A protein has these predicted regions:
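Ferredoxin-like alpha/beta domains used as RNA- or RNAP-binding modules
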Residues: 1-159, 165, 188, 201, ...
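Basic (Lys/Arg-enriched) interaction patch that binds polyanionic ligands
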Residues: 155-207
Length: 235
């Protein structure tokens, strides 16, 4: 973690200590902030929404969030939405995530910035959008959607798993790590030697975001039969 990000998390620690919200944090930020809070004996609660554990808020009290429906006739992708949102130069801690449910697009955000988002987030790519605040209960039955796959690997090394998903050679996979195409638990990693465990999350640029599932068994040749879940945005 670079110095400016660590300094930012020190500020988030102070906010939590004063009874305010940390904003939405990714997995790496969660790990560091938890260490800081525990080290300084600061009490906190962790709040997640819509089954997403990779974007949570640390706070002493339940924070207020707003759910906005994104109305458009265009077909949008998660990457399009993220790119257009952050083109507004908005702090990532304001946004929980973008979701799809029942053929509709949604986003959930820190309520303090609701009016600003309603006023300024009006376009995704070349497509005009309209935002409307809806009740959180509208998505009470929402759950993250996955495409499940089964792979055979000789070990739980991250590079072995990436090789199976991409069907790339070991040398090509090394290039992916070198070129910063791989993020593990929301941190860029340059080596695939780490051993992953169930529920760990990683992403491969241009391929998608994945979660390590259960071990389904072992083959006679002693390979692991491993479940991998790919996050799906549209259903």
């Amino acid at each position: 973690m670079i110095k400016k990000d660590y300094i930012s998390l020190l500020h988030q620690m102070e906010l939590v200590e004063r009874g305010k919200s940390s904003g939405f944090l990714n997995l790496q930020e969660q790990k560091v902030l938890k260490q800081l809070l525990d080290k300084n004996h600061i009490s906190y609660q962790v709040y997640s929404y819509f089954g997403h554990q990779d974007r949570v808020i640390y706070s002493k009290n339940r924070p207020k969030i707003s759910l906005l429906e994104i109305m458009t006739d265009a077909q949008l992708t998660h990457q399009m939405l993220l790119g257009s949102f952050f083109a507004l130069q908005i702090d990532s801690k304001i946004l929980g995530d973008f979701l799809t449910y029942g053929g509709r697009y949604y986003m959930y955000i820190d309520s303090k910035y609701r009016d600003y988002i309603l006023e300024n987030f009006r376009q995704v790519g070349r497509n005009t959008i309209t935002l409307k605040e809806v009740h959180l209960h509208d998505l009470e039955h929402y759950r993250p959607q996955f495409e499940e796959m089964t792979i055979l690997v000789g070990s739980y090394r991250l590079d072995s798993i990436v090789s199976k998903i991409t069907n790339y050679s070991r040398s090509k996979v090394k290039e992916l790590f070198h070129d910063e195409w791989i993020r593990y638990m929301d941190e860029v990693v340059y080596s695939g030697s780490m051993i992953v465990k169930e529920n760990d999350i990683f992403s491969i640029k241009k391929f998608g975001k994945y979660q390590v599932g259960i071990q389904k068994g072992k083959t006679k040749s002693n390979k692991f039969v491993l479940e991998i879940k790919k996050y799906m945005f549209l259903k």
